[in-house]
Amino acid sequence: SWTEFRNSTLHYINLAQEHFFKNNQHEFNTSFTMATRLIAFHQLGCRLLKHEMVKKNLRREARRLLKKLITSMARIGVNSNLFFCSPQRISLINQLAASRQSDPRDSKVSITSTNTTIPDPSRSSASTIPSFLNQESPARPIRNFSSSTTDTLMFSEDWQSNSPNLESPQEIPSTRTSVPSLNAPLSFSVIDDESGILVQSLFQVIDTEFFRFKKNVVKLHDLMQAHFGQGDLPQLFPRFFKGHFNEGAWTNPFHQGYEYGSAQNSDSSPVFDSSQQQANDSLGNRSYSVPSKDHTSFRGFSVSSKATSTASSSNAKHSITGKPSHTRTFSRAKIMKRNRYPLNGDTLNLLKKKFNFIIINYYGNDHRLIDQPKSKKRNLELSADTYKALNYIVDMIEVLENLDLTFFVNLRNMSHDEKLDRESEELRKHAMTSLASTLMEFFEIKQALHDIAIRQIMDVQGLTLDDPFVFCAIRDESVCYFDREDELSKYQFLKQEKFAEELRNLLISQDVEYNDLAFLDADQLVREAFAKFSDIGNTMLQNVEQLIEERENILNYAARMMKSDLTAALMKGEQEKWFEDEDFDMASSAEGNENLDFGDAQNKSFSRDIPWYLDSEHEYSLIYDNKGNIKGGTKEALLEHLTSHQSIDLSFNLAMLLTFRSIFTTGEFLQALVERYNLYPPEGVSYEEYNIWVEKKQKPVKIRVVNIMKTLFSQYWTPSYYEPGLDYMIGFAQLAKSQKISGADVLLSAIKGRLSMKGNLKNFVPESINFSDDGSSTTTVPQSSRSSVSAPVGSSSTTGFRMRKLKLLDIDSLDYAKQLTIKEHSLFYKISPFECLDRTWGNKYCNMGGSKNITEFISNSNHLTNYVSFMIVKQTDIKKRIQLIQFFINVAAHCHELNNFSSLTAIISALYSSPIYRLKRTWAAVPEEYKKLLEELNTLMDSAKNFIRYRQLLKSIGDFPCVPFFGVYLSDLTFTANGNPDFLHRNTVLVNFGKRVRILEILKEISVYQRSHYKLKRYEDIQAFIESSLENLPSIEKQYAQSLRNEPRTEVSTGLNSTNVNYRYNTKNGPENRNTGKRLKFGKAKKQSANLLSQ
């Protein structure tokens, strides 16, 4: 912060002043050098905040204070060198020491906030000043040191308030009557002739400038502290820093405050705000970071970093002069849009293609060239190949920098989601734990590619050097000095000889030949650089592949656990579409179609030859797709089509009645239907035309309105739709009945029954909806009695075993699969469309009454998964584990035969869960035919491309009984509702009705499989066994701990060590990867970790 900056600067300047009074040139130079560095950082900090300072009109004041600081710093530096080099001072050292010993007042000091005891220059008496400085001269009035000021320097903000106005040297509170100006040149003749007077003047100037220096430091601090909020400094050290970094060519999606698709707050801290970005751009700052494991927060999954910079020294020079470097380049870069590469197999293949091209076409040839005798031709060819390969390396880095890691960012951000259920939170924590090292390694690989690209250029350039140490930097800031106070009294050497001896010793300490160092072998460095790049490239491909697999595994596991909300949250913001079929992408198709397609002409009123007064008023406000189905329209047009007098659109009616609550409120919808019932004739019709209008439009519309209301209240009503003030609907039904509208009496009875319940969901039993294409959407069996429909043909209470002796392996795998199927189908049959809508919308539009049956169905499947994994992992005997694995694979195969895809998915998820799949010794003993069968079943239920294999199989089942995997429907509903806009063409006028139609299609498909029933025999003892076994199961974390006890983890240590290169290259097949792998979470291979920072 600026406060810490101020304290550090005053600390070092006080130390410098203390050593100045003590005549300690060495310590003075050290402290004063640190103070000058801090002043340079003050200037850099103001430079980085220049945009904000211009907005706040602070730039002129800051420049004035900085100019004063630099002036004081220069005066102190020049005059202190003259002072310490003065022969008069050297000859009077002993006199100064004697004066200090004889006068006890020398101990009068002021205590500063740095806890350092130093002489207070504003309170110094005559005895504390060397006698040679106390000489009087008529030519130059001397300060009267007998009287002192009462001002004391303080670090706190009270310094400025307690000090008088000190804007000019004349106003300094002291008895100084004259101070020599530095504007007049000081010649050596003056030093020789008037040495005493000059030394006294130098002391006074330095004393004054120290005072001014401190005053201006505090003023600059107060200025910045008052106008920049928390007082945070901008980023001054692009080479080394802690925390998050996302600048220049380095991208870090885990950067603090970074969100996809949103801009940062302009009022944020100067460290991260937009002005900081502009300042960095103007400085030509191209900094890259490497995450540090010491600064990684696993709670939030935030990747912190320490960065190493590749910014050149020329860019730093630009920052000092205030002129932006590469202005034109960065102004173009700001408007350049980066493409995000999805985390999938296509991106991995692209990286492999680029990497193999580099190895085969460039580095393969370079390995042959480097073994040839040294020559200019060889070096030139090596340099040419390296610079050509650099273009492809940059392309690889570009892909890595823009790799879409939104999935893992979402996983991190979900830690604060209070809506996350316990199982989802356990899955998230488990995934975060196993992913942390992989993501850290990804950032290390990125930095390693940056480093190796630069290293290759430097090493190839070194081939042309006669002296390979020409680019080696000598240690900076080395000061050659000797303390003349004591040394001259001991040794009778001339000053020049002593200085030369110190310089010689310094150069010898830095000479390579005197430090037992070997000269570099440039050819060997090039070989190591090529091999290092190959190792980094191989590790990079493995790491990206593992990230892809981890993402797919988590999605697959979440989908199989039927966590649709979790899946949607994880995929939020990703570019990849969930639905491959373009029919599902309603948002893009609707918004991208500016030329409206009105579909089949014979179904549209405006394409027929009908009288104008019978035409539909809002027909032109509807949008149709290529199949003639309504895709969108205004609310008025949709209601007109719902009660059309010309034709009945059954599919449209079903979709509207089922999803109307997402378009209207209940009161709006019913009031619009009442207004539609009270239709008025158009103006300008004749008597004959009016009679025709009544017969062909008004009466049909009234009948349609009554039928729609009747269907709504009898089949599609839920107490969640109730709103106060709907009692007028009873009067409307009575009016329709008095007008002898068909179905009005049934409507009146339905309205009275539904409104009497008001909003009471406790005793409400939804009716089953028949989604038939013939329009006979009639009420079937109430949900309360639906369980009896799925009852088996026969039942038995025993299977030949007594229940108290019944064990899992005593049950035949086919019988176990059948009983699981009966149980799953019974739970599946109870699910109603309103529960599906509740899962889809939540409380967005209204409280749909919850989804108890869906929750029970999902819990049963997840408990089955936990039970399967627990039964295997709790066995300490490897033979029993193998036996149980074979049993459950057989059960899964039988579930497949029975079309019970719910239990099939649950068992596969258990066998591929981390506690089970990591048991290498156990799986090695499982027969190959079982592993092959399991792999086939896993491929069938793979979530790749939105369960495309499973969907294809499901379509071929037809009317056979089936228990579908309900997670697919939940995902379809979630992504249809959340992945498509409610309105088309980016406005709130055209309702996206195609989105509602898609929801109806999903609910129709669910209802198809609910109508098909199994004819299986129910065994009560097995059912009771299954019920009891699915209770009180340990969590996945406890099971994983038990798995580690059964088969402890084997440590594998390998990496990219530049000193031991394990690289083999095949010119035909490309680089060979000799790294072995190990299995991690969800059964996927995890590559061996590598320490890429070892150089």
From Swiss-Prot:
**Per UniProt, what is the membrane topology?**
Single-pass membrane protein
The yes or no answer to whether the keyword Cell cycle is present is yes
Single Gene Ontology BP annotation:
Ras protein signal transduction
Q: What is its main location?
A: membrane
Q: Where does the sequence pass through the membrane?
A: 959-980
Q: Name one Pfam family in it.
A: RasGEF
- Domain N-terminal Ras-GEF stretches: 626-756
Q: SUPFAM superfamilies, per this entry?
A: Ras GEF (SSF48366)
Q: Where is the composition biased (Low complexity)?
A: 309-319, 776-798
* Listed name of the protein: Cell division control protein 25
Q: What taxonomic classification does the UniProt entry list for its organism?
A: Eukaryota, Fungi, Dikarya, Ascomycota, Saccharomycotina
